[in-house]
Regions:
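Zymogen propeptides
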Residues: 3-225
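Conserved hydrophobic/aromatic beta-strand scaffold that supports enzyme active sites
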Residues: 154-158, 233, 266, 288, ...
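Extracytoplasmic
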Residues: 152-154, 188-190, 229-231, 262, ...
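Short, solvent-exposed aromatic-acidic interface loops
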Residues: 170-177, 248-252, 302-306
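General beta-strand structural signal in soluble alpha/beta enzymes
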Residues: 193-197, 244, 269, 328-334
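Conserved, well-ordered active-site substructure
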Residues: 206-227, 277-327, 332, 337-368
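Active-site-adjacent helix-turn-beta-strand microarchitecture at beta-sheet edges
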Residues: 200-279
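Short acidic-glycine loop/turn motifs at beta-strand connectors
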Residues: 160-163, 235-241, 269-270, 291-295, ...
């Protein structure tokens, strides 16, 4: 009898210990859950308070810069709409915009100076086409410069022979079709360099990169675009002159456009720089293309949304292109797509953890 009572007591003691252990685990779990959600609420509350201060605080300049930058991104516009009315946002964007050009490129202003450096009669060539070109010490026809300003850093690639610059594109277009990353696009064409290209469908920043928007000419073929519809056309004609302007796809074909995409805005047309309200835009990663009077092509990519490089405005792009002698220049797709590849290396990277898939790119062919 005594043994039975003792055994029963042991069982009860063990049950109590198990219950206490379960209670401790449950208490720890509840505390951890409360801490996690409390931390999330504090962080979220702090973030919303920061957005409130930026958008409704004492500095209109910071507010305008934030709004203009966020509205240019795929998903950032949601943050802007939390505290500002549509009318306020529209006014801010209008006060930081780039005016459209009504004219297109006068191709007679560009005189292609490049000549084949292997020509026997090198005495008749411009220095831009010879091996002793001071801008091209290694003789590969490409020079890359570092560019930087108060809010940005990036690279300017100068390609001395404009006939080497083409539009690379994927084989099939479609909303569900996958695009190619820039390194893969450059590899597809066995090119030596490349930058991202034109506009494409990217709803909420999660698109497949397989559907261009606007116009696409690649190696003389109209791959995308209605011949009767008007587009912003940025690309090269059969004389290797960069053409910048608003025109129909049919007109573009009639003037011999061989490689072109759509984006915008135009930055410089016929030596005239775009007129701007405010800074012309927000600060973001940027990609742009230009051409000098001697025909050399300017490929510019600016890093952004990083602690070391917030990004560039349209006014910054115009200034850079002016400094490098552009007579025509245009803004291309930017943001998370902005990147530059050279000799198999991504020398300017996207601001995301992974490379974006895109349908078009300006690629630089290898020399024969």
């Amino acid at each position: 009898m005594w043994y039975a009572i003792e055994e029963s007591g042991d069982i009860m003691s063990k049950k109590k210990k198990k219950a206490k252990k379960k209670n401790k685990i449950l208490t720890a779990f509840l505390c951890l859950t409360a801490w996690f959600f409390g931390t999330v609420l504090v962080v979220l509350g702090g973030f919303l308070f920061l957005l409130y201060l930026v958008q409704l605080g004492p500095s209109p300049r910071i507010r305008d810069l934030f709004v203009a930058s966020a509205k240019e991104s795929s998903v950032g516009g949601v943050m802007v709409d939390l505290f500002l009315s549509p009318e306020q946002v529209e006014e801010i964007m209008a006060n930081n915009s780039t005016k459209e050009f009504s004219e297109i490129t006068d191709t007679t202003m560009v005189k292609i100076a490049y000549a084949n450096s292997e020509s026997k009669d090198s005495s008749s060539q411009s220095s831009i086409g010879r091996l002793d070109n001071p801008e091209d010490p290694d003789g590969d026809g490409i020079t890359v410069y570092d560019v930087h300003g108060p809010t940005y850093r990036g690279k300017m690639m100068v390609v001395f022979d404009p006939s080497r610059v083409k539009v690379g594109t994927i084989d099939h277009y479609g909303i569900s079709s996958p695009g190619l990353t820039l390194p893969d696009m450059v590899e597809k064409y066995d090119a030596v360099a490349g930058i991202n290209g034109g506009k494409y469908d990217d709803e909420a920043g999660i698109g497949t990169g397989g559907m261009p928007q606007g116009i696409v000419f690649s190696e003389g073929v109209l791959r995308m675009g209605d011949p009767t519809s008007n587009y912003e056309v940025y690309g090269f004609d059969n004389n290797n002159v960069l053409v910048v302007g608003h025109m129909s796809a049919g007109y573009a074909a009639s003037i011999g456009i061989r490689d072109a995409v759509t984006f915008g805005p135009a930055l410089i047309v016929n030596g005239k720089s775009a007129r701007m309200a405010g800074s012309g835009s927000g600060l973001n990663p940027r990609t742009a293309i230009g051409q000098r009077e001697d025909g050399a092509v300017l490929l510019l990519v600016i890093e952004g949304r990083q602690t070391t490089s917030l990004g560039a405005s349209m006014a910054d792009l115009v200034e850079i292109m002016e400094n490098y002698g552009a007579v025509n220049a245009a803004n291309l797709d930017g943001g998370m797509s902005s990147s530059m590849v050279y000799n198999g290396e991504e020398i300017v990277s996207s601001c995301t953890m992974r490379n974006r898939k895109i349908p078009t790119a300006f690629i630089v062919e290898r020399r024969d």
